[in-house]
Amino acid sequence: MPKKEGVIEIEGTVVEALPNAMFRVELSNGHKVLAHISGKMRQHYIRILPEDRVVVELSPYDLTRGRIVYRYK
Protein backbone atom coordinates (compact mmCIF):
# COMPACT_ATOMS: atom_id res chain seq x y z
CA MET A 1 0.00 0.00 0.00
CA PRO A 2 1.50 3.38 -0.93
CA LYS A 3 2.29 5.81 1.88
CA LYS A 4 0.09 8.88 2.18
CA GLU A 5 1.81 12.18 1.56
CA GLY A 6 1.79 14.81 4.26
CA VAL A 7 0.80 12.62 7.20
CA ILE A 8 2.97 11.87 10.22
CA GLU A 9 3.03 8.26 11.46
CA ILE A 10 4.16 7.74 15.05
CA GLU A 11 3.98 4.93 17.61
CA GLY A 12 2.12 5.26 20.87
CA THR A 13 0.33 3.47 23.69
CA VAL A 14 -3.42 3.63 24.33
CA VAL A 15 -4.00 5.26 27.73
CA GLU A 16 -7.80 5.21 27.92
CA ALA A 17 -10.83 4.24 25.84
CA LEU A 18 -13.44 6.96 25.36
CA PRO A 19 -17.01 6.78 23.95
CA ASN A 20 -17.64 6.56 20.19
CA ALA A 21 -14.50 4.54 19.41
CA MET A 22 -12.19 7.37 20.49
CA PHE A 23 -8.98 6.77 22.41
CA ARG A 24 -6.45 8.85 24.31
CA VAL A 25 -3.01 7.79 23.05
CA GLU A 26 0.34 8.69 24.60
CA LEU A 27 2.89 9.00 21.81
CA SER A 28 6.47 7.80 22.04
CA ASN A 29 7.63 11.42 22.42
CA GLY A 30 5.40 11.94 25.50
CA HIS A 31 2.55 13.94 23.91
CA LYS A 32 -1.06 12.80 24.35
CA VAL A 33 -3.49 12.91 21.42
CA LEU A 34 -7.13 12.04 20.80
CA ALA A 35 -7.43 9.31 18.16
CA HIS A 36 -10.17 7.35 16.41
CA ILE A 37 -10.00 3.98 14.64
CA SER A 38 -9.48 3.90 10.88
CA GLY A 39 -12.29 2.55 8.69
CA LYS A 40 -10.50 -0.68 7.72
CA MET A 41 -9.85 -1.53 11.38
CA ARG A 42 -13.55 -0.93 12.10
CA GLN A 43 -14.58 -3.14 9.16
CA HIS A 44 -12.44 -6.03 10.37
CA TYR A 45 -13.57 -5.66 14.03
CA ILE A 46 -10.06 -5.09 15.36
CA ARG A 47 -10.39 -4.47 19.08
CA ILE A 48 -8.25 -1.86 20.81
CA LEU A 49 -7.79 -1.93 24.57
CA PRO A 50 -5.85 0.29 26.98
CA GLU A 51 -2.11 -0.53 27.08
CA ASP A 52 -2.11 -1.64 23.39
CA ARG A 53 0.78 -0.38 21.25
CA VAL A 54 -0.54 1.33 18.11
CA VAL A 55 0.56 3.40 15.13
CA VAL A 56 -1.19 6.78 14.86
CA GLU A 57 -1.43 8.96 11.74
CA LEU A 58 -1.37 12.69 12.49
CA SER A 59 -2.26 15.50 10.12
CA PRO A 60 0.25 18.35 10.00
CA TYR A 61 -2.69 20.76 10.40
CA ASP A 62 -3.93 19.46 13.79
CA LEU A 63 -1.38 17.59 15.89
CA THR A 64 -3.82 17.00 18.77
CA ARG A 65 -6.03 14.53 16.85
CA GLY A 66 -5.14 11.41 14.93
CA ARG A 67 -6.24 8.12 13.40
CA ILE A 68 -5.18 4.69 14.69
CA VAL A 69 -4.05 2.70 11.65
CA TYR A 70 -2.30 -0.33 13.17
CA ARG A 71 -2.32 -2.32 16.42
CA TYR A 72 0.77 -4.35 17.27
CA LYS A 73 0.13 -7.99 18.16
Curated annotation (Swiss-Prot):
Residues 1-73 form the S1-like domain. Keywords: Cytoplasm, Initiation factor, Protein biosynthesis, RNA-binding, rRNA-binding. It is found in: Cytoplasm. SUPFAM superfamilies: Nucleic acid-binding proteins (SSF50249). InterPro entries: NA-bd_OB-fold, RNA-binding_domain_S1_IF1, S1_domain, TIF_IF1. One of its GO terms (molecular function) is ribosome binding. GO terms for cellular component: cytosol. The keyword Thylakoid does not apply. SMART domains: S1. NCBIfam families: infA. One of the essential components for the initiation of protein synthesis. Stabilizes the binding of IF-2 and IF-3 on the 30S subunit to which N-formylmethionyl-tRNA(fMet) subsequently binds. Helps modulate mRNA selection, yielding the 30S pre-initiation complex (PIC). Upon addition of the 50S ribosomal subunit IF-1, IF-2 and IF-3 are released leaving the mature 70S translation initiation complex. Component of the 30S ribosomal translation pre-initiation complex which assembles on the 30S ribosome in the order IF-2 and IF-3, IF-1 and N-formylmethionyl-tRNA(fMet); mRNA recruitment can occur at any time during PIC assembly. Belongs to the IF-1 family. This is Translation initiation factor IF-1. It comes from Nocardioides sp. (strain ATCC BAA-499 / JS614).
